[in-house]
A protein has these predicted regions:
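A conserved loop-to-beta-strand element in the N-lobe of protein kinase catalytic cores
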Residues: 7, 16-24, 32-33
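Conserved catalytic-loop aspartate of Hanks-type protein kinases
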Residues: 128
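Activation segment signature within eukaryotic-like protein kinase domains
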Residues: 51-52
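Protein kinase catalytic-loop region centered on the HRD/HxD motif
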Residues: 57-67
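Activation-segment/catalytic-loop signature of the eukaryotic protein kinase fold
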Residues: 12
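AlphaC helix of the protein kinase catalytic domain
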Residues: 32-43
């Protein structure tokens, strides 16, 4: 895919029964590792906006090709040498046919599953935007998930209720809180 915000894939091959993917080098790691390095502290709001918008632009490009990513998470958002976000790991992405508007297979990482996926309903690119909302929350809380539980069943119930702790008071703009609410 030819986008400044989608990681480039060059090749893949099997070796010893394992799939190896050759992709663009991302020298500045992943958003997940960056959040871990923050040691529980939120990113500054200007960085949150930058990374969120760049990830959104990458997803817009993916969606324009009728592809649903299906595994949007901080571990799959990489940084290039200029600290631009690159949407990566489209290994479980779903290409929709021209006549198809929704996918049905449940895949992805539990913390990032949209309510539609939790309810085993058809879903579309809005599920990717929902997962990006989870990433947005992580950036604002130093890596915390908006929906957390001791087991998958309890996690799914929390996701379906849609109730999460508000962002730290006074730390982020009302616009950012509004965008988060629109995503989740």
């Amino acid at each position: 895919m030819d986008s400044k915000y989608v990681i480039k894939y060059y090749d893949c091959f099997l070796e010893d029964g394992k799939l190896n993917i050759v992709m663009q080098y991302a020298p500045n790691g992943t958003l997940h590792s960056r959040l871990h390095a923050q040691r529980g502290k939120a990113l500054p709001e200007d960085k949150v906006w930058q990374f969120f918008i760049q990830a959104l632009l990458g997803l817009r490009h993916v969606h324009s090709k009728k592809i649903i990513h299906r595994d949007v998470k901080s571990l799959n958002l990489f940084f290039d040498q200029d600290d631009n976000v690159l949407v990566g790991d489209l290994g479980i992405a779903k290409v929709l046919s021209p006549n198809t508007m929704f996918a049905r297979t449940i895949v992805g990482t539990p913390y990032y599953l949209s309510p539609e996926l939790c309810e085993d309903k058809p879903y579309n690119e809005k599920s990717d935007v929902w997962a990006l909302g989870v990433v947005l929350y992580e950036m604002c809380t130093g890596g915390k998930h908006p929906f957390d539980a001791q087991n998958e069943g309890a996690l799914i119930r929390k996701i379906m209720k849609g109730v999460y702790a508000p962002l730290p008071g006074g730390k982020f703009s009302s616009q950012l809180s509004d965008v988060l609410r629109a995503c989740l």
